[in-house]
């Protein structure tokens, strides 16, 4: 009886390894990796390969909505001549989380007097100010006062990271440094899609980075978006991957796992026989 278990584990391990290796090798040759660019409100069934050739697919993706969760904006100092953040080796920043009204950057004490998460810039006769703007292209803006702790120099004004619709706004603190708000960094971005197949099925779902959708042998990954528009992007780029040999790779791995279980059972039986 123990001999049968050992024999079975040997066969499962070696056959499983053989199947997994052969399938992985063939899959590497037959794998399709395509890139598809979709636009809000329209279905797309064409994608390009790594050579730029256009390929028609047996499925179509319609982008219903695109959302981005962003990290809170930051305030930083830059060198007026080089544009580099300061200090150069270890740049400092003030993170404008909810409720933050004060911060320090090197010798400058900052006091936030007004924050507008959805803002638009408005040009006046002698300056640029920001007002609430709850529509596409809105940007983040703060009105602040900066006081130099060494010489008591005071500067105040609007600072904004800007958007594809409105320019960024910085404050020139002195001849050497300026206070800026870099572009906000994406924390999470996702696409709500509707997928159509030739068989007539319609599947709705959400695709995120590292959370692909799988349909008819295709894995659909969130790749990128229109970074010039940021959170207002109406374009989403997907990577579609198809490996026809992947089920065989999994089958080989399962066989090896089963072989390991058989080996464990065989060892347990042998211990029981030795005790007897």
Predicted regions and their residues:
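Solvent-exposed, non-transmembrane regions of integral membrane proteins
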Residues: 1-276
């Amino acid at each position: 009886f123990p001999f049968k278990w050992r024999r079975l584990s040997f066969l499962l391990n070696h056959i499983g390894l053989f199947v997994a290796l052969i399938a992985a090798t063939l899959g590497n040759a037959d794998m399709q990796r395509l890139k598809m660019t979709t636009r809000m409100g329209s279905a797309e069934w064409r994608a390009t390969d790594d050579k730029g050739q256009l390929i028609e697919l047996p499925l179509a993706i319609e982008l219903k909505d695109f959302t981005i969760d962003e990290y809170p904006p930051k305030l930083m100092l830059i060198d007026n001549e080089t544009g580099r953040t300061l200090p150069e080796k270890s740049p400092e920043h003030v993170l404008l989380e909810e409720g933050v009204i004060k911060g320090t950057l090197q010798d400058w004490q900052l006091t936030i007097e007004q924050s507008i998460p959805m803002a638009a810039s408005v040009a006046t006769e002698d300056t640029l100010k920001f007002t609430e703007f709850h529509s596409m292209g809105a940007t983040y803006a703060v009105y602040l006062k900066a006081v130099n702790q060494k010489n008591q120099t005071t500067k105040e004004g609007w600072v904004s990271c800007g958007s594809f619709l409105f320019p960024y706004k910085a404050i020139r603190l002195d001849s050497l440094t300026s206070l800026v708000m870099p572009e906000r960094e994406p924390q999470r971005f996702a696409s709500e899609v509707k997928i159509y197949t030739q068989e007539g099925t319609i599947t709705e779902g959400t695709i995120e980075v590292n959370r692909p959708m799988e349909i008819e042998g295709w894995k659909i990954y969130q790749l990128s978006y229109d970074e010039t528009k940021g959170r207002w992007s109406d374009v989403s780029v997907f990577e579609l991957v198809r490996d026809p040999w992947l089920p065989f790779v999994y089958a080989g791995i399962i066989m090896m796992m089963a072989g390991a279980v058989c080996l464990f059972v065989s060892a347990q039986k042998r211990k029981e026989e030795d005790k007897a």
